[in-house]
């Protein structure tokens, strides 16, 4: 018996509830933006890896281990509303290296597109703009938002509340008893 042939699946939605299409790390955003990394992401699975070199020399370029994969994941969590972007030690190192630095992203939340920018060092206000890209947010500034209001303004808080209360839609195929 082929169980998959029996399932009659209909999509509940065309897009994920939350996804990031672009993440940009800035050394500074004004007067002239200096981009350190500009990372395009796609819906679905994005694999983050760093190739290891054959060179065991401690002065060789960083690769594989200590290449920033965990920091990247922490920055993703930060643009999604987490209050920190690393351990205390790592945040201090980043703030020292990038006192005017920030991370920005194009985020999609419950069908709405947002451009966001969050600081590493100077200033604790984040900036958001609906129906905009990171580039447009930099040009037009967007609205300043405190850390406490950030998830609520983007709709992330309501989405998390729905997840906690079980208000998210379940497809009938997943609730059907197995025979």
Language model regions located:
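Extreme N-terminal "head/tail" segments of very large remodeling/mechanoenzyme assemblies
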Residues: 1-114, 118, 126-128
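Glycine-rich phosphate-binding loops of NTPases
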Residues: 122-179
């Amino acid at each position: 018996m082929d169980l998959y042939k029996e399932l009659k699946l209909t999509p509940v939605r065309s897009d994920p509830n939350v996804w990031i299409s672009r993440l940009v790390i800035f050394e500074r955003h004004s007067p002239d933006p200096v981009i350190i990394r500009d990372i395009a992401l796609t819906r679905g699975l994005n694999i983050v890896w760093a190739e290891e070199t054959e060179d065991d020399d401690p002065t060789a370029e960083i690769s594989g281990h200590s290449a920033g994969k965990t920091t990247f994941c922490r920055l993703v969590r930060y643009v999604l509303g987490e209050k920190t972007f690393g351990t205390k030690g790592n945040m201090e190192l980043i703030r020292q290296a990038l006192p005017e630095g920030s991370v920005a992203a194009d985020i999609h939340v419950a069908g709405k597109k947002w451009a966001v920018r969050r600081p590493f060092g100077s200033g604790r206000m984040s900036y958001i703009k609906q129906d905009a890209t990171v580039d447009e947010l930099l040009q037009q500034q967007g609205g300043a938002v405190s850390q406490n209001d950030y998830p609520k303004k983007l709709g992330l808080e309501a989405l998390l509340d729905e997840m906690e209360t079980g208000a998210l839609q379940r497809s009938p195929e997943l609730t059907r008893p197995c025979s």
